[in-house]
C-alpha cells in the first residue's frame, strides 16, 4: 500500500519541500485511510503539515455520522480538523437542493459546491496541495463516465494539477489502489468502513457505471487498471495547455473559465427553483 502511494506522491513532487497539505476527509474508509497513510509517512517530518478538512453538505442522518468519524480519526492522529458547511456559505443544504427535483441529479449540485468549498478553504488555509481519497475504482469510474458523456474537456481536467490562479493543486495519492485494498487497510488499522451510502446516490448515473465496471472487473480481472493505463497514455497526446488560466467569477470571486463559475450557475438554478 505505502509503496503504491509513494510512487504516486513522487510524481506530484509536492513533498520535496516545506509544505502544508490539506486532506479532504469525508469519514469513509478511503479518506480516513489516506489521512492515516500520509500521517504515517510524514508525521516525523517537521517540514510537512497536515490539516484534515470535512465538508458538511447538510445530508440528514448521514453526514453528521461521517463527520464524527472524521473527527475521531483526526483526534487519534493528532491532526487538526476543519469543518465547513454548505449552510454557512451557500445558505442551502444538499437535502434542500435534492427536494427541488431538478433535472440534474443531486450529486451534480453537491459535487460542484463541495469541490468549490474544498478549494476555497484549502486556499484560505494556505495549502500547497489538496489531497483527496479517490482510489483506482473512483478514477476508473470517472474516466468511463466522461467517455459515456463524450466530455473530453473534463477528461483532460483529470490530469495532475497544475499551478492555476486561485486553484490549490489537487493530488490523488490513492489513484493506483483498488477499493478492496482500501477496505483491507481500513480494517487492519481500525479505521471507519463507512456509514452506508448517501441517500441521494441512487439518482446518480455514477452508480450504474460503478456496477457495470465491477461486473467487467469480475469477468475480466485488470479492467480498471487497463482503463487508467489507457487514460494516462491519452493525457500524453494533448499539450498541457499551461497558457490557460482561470478568471475570477464576477459574482463570488472564485476561479472560473468564463467569468461565472459553475458553482454560481448552479446556485442560480436552485434560487430560481
Model-derived features with residue positions:
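Short cysteine-rich clusters marking metal-coordination/redox-active sites
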Residues: 1, 248-252, 261-264
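Cys/His-rich microdomains that often coordinate metals
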Residues: 1, 256, 268
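Short, flexible, mixed-charge glycine/proline-rich loop motifs
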Residues: 235-245, 251-256
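Cys/His-enriched microdomains
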Residues: 105, 225, 247, 259-262
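Short, non-ligating residues that shape and space the ligands of small metal-coordination modules
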Residues: 257-259, 270-273
Amino acid at each position: 500500500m505505502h509503496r503504491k502511494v509513494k510512487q504516486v506522491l513522487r510524481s506530484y513532487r509536492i513533498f520535496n519541500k516545506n509544505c502544508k497539505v490539506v486532506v479532504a476527509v469525508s469519514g469513509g474508509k478511503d479518506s480516513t485511510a489516506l489521512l492515516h497513510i500520509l500521517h504515517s509517512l510524514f508525521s516525523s517530518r517537521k517540514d510537512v503539515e497536515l490539516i484534515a478538512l470535512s465538508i458538511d453538505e447538510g445530508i440528514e442522518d448521514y453526514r453528521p455520522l461521517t463527520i464524527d468519524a472524521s473527527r475521531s480519526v483526526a483526534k487519534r492522529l493528532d491532526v487538526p480538523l476543519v469543518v465547513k458547511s454548505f449552510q454557512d456559505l451557500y445558505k442551502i443544504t444538499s437535502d434542500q437542493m435534492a427536494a427541488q427535483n431538478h433535472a440534474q441529479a443531486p450529486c451534480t449540485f453537491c459535487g460542484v459546491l463541495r469541490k468549490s468549498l474544498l478549494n476555497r478553504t484549502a486556499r484560505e488555509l494556505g495549502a500547497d496541495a489538496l489531497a483527496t481519497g479517490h482510489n483506482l475504482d473512483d478514477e476508473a469510474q470517472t474516466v468511463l463516465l466522461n467517455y459515456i458523456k463524450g466530455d473530453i474537456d473534463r477528461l483532460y481536467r483529470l490530469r495532475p494539477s497544475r499551478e492555476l490562479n486561485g486553484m490549490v493543486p489537487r493530488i490523488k495519492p490513492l489513484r493506483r489502489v483498488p477499493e478492496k485494498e482500501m477496505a483491507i487497510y481500513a480494517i487492519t488499522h481500525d479505521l471507519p468502513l463507512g456509514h452506508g451510502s448517501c441517500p441521494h446516490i441512487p439518482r446518480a448515473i455514477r452508480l450504474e457505471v460503478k456496477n457495470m465496471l465491477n461486473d467487467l472487473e469480475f469477468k475480466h480481472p485488470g479492467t480498471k487498471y487497463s482503463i487508467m493505463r489507457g487514460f494516462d497514455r491519452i493525457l500524453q497526446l494533448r499539450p498541457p495547455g499551461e497558457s490557460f488560466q482561470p478568471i475570477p467569477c464576477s459574482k463570488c470571486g472564485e476561479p472560473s473559465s468564463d467569468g461565472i463559475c459553475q458553482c454560481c450557475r448552479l446556485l442560480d438554478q436552485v434560487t430560481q427553483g
